[in-house]
Amino acid sequence: MFIVKYYIAGAILAFISLLFSTNIYIGIFSAWVGLSLTLVSLAYIFDLPWIFRKKTNGSIPFYIRWLFVPFLLGSQLYNFYARKYDKVPAIQKIDPQLFLACRLFPSDIPTLQKAGVSAILDVTAEFDGLDWTAENEQLDYFNLPVLDHKSPKSEELLKAIYWLENHITHTHGVVIHCALGRGRSVLVMAAYLLSKNPSWSVEQALTKIQGIRATANLNKVQLKALKRFHQEGLFKLQTPLWIIANPVSGAGKWPTNKAEIIERLSPYFLLHILETTEHTSAATLTQQAINQGAKTIIACGG
């Protein structure tokens, strides 16, 4: 919680400046800064990441961006400086198909594509993501809004794990990033590694990450949350949801809507998708799914 002290101090100084200002423009600017930092302080005190209204595609509404310009500008300058002088590379490969990074910029897209990354998990709340860039470059993008130095709620963390598993299962390289690549992104990556390695301890998962990214370091709040989630068995993934689709029936709606369906279901289920062909019927695929332990099967098409 130490970071909130700086926001509170900044808000107080801004309102003091407003109180003693005789210039209307300085007064307006001081009020703007004071209001922005006050709202940010409240967000941190009460753990309200939604205050930034960041959407799952990483975008923040225009009016929110203007309200928080003093904070967002300061945050961007700090992130840029910290990244430039960081001891480790901005993007690092932790596991096959799994990368860890600090704040990403559009200039990072070619590097990600060269590394085989086609999906981005953004675990920040306080700044715009690569929403338009990712869409233009056909990258899958998902935002899990978490405030700096905080940990996600259990249900939100589970969404991230399912989303990661669905993309990695389909041979997509995935990068998880926060502001500095040290806390929030490390927590989510450790949670995913624990879901894939049930016999591991929290310490083993963190050691795996820190062996590559030396600056990875959870604070006390984040470490306590990760250990609690692990003890509660949160990372035990449920039985997959199977989808059997006929791509030509229903006027061919499945190919048109497939990407959206996957996007909507990925944060909630492990997806196994099978498609019928001229020589493979839905009945054959259904039996195949049952033989592999399927408990829930959804038929699409027609």
PLM regions with names:
Residues 2-132, 211-237:
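Cys-based phosphatase fold recognition centered on the PTP superfamily
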Residues 81-173, 197, 204, 217-223, ...:
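Cysteine-based protein phosphatase catalytic domain of the PTP/DSP
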Residues 104, 180, 277-281, 301:
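Short beta->alpha linker loops
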Residues 123-124, 245, 301:
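Glycine-rich, N-terminal phosphate-binding loop of Rossmann-like dinucleotide-binding domains
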Residues 137, 230-297:
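ATP/NTP phosphate-donor binding region
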Residues 171-190, 297-302:
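A phosphate-binding catalytic loop at a beta-strand-loop-alpha-helix junction
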Residues 188-193, 286:
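Buried hydrophobic packing segments
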Residues 194-209, 294:
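Phosphate-handling active-site elements
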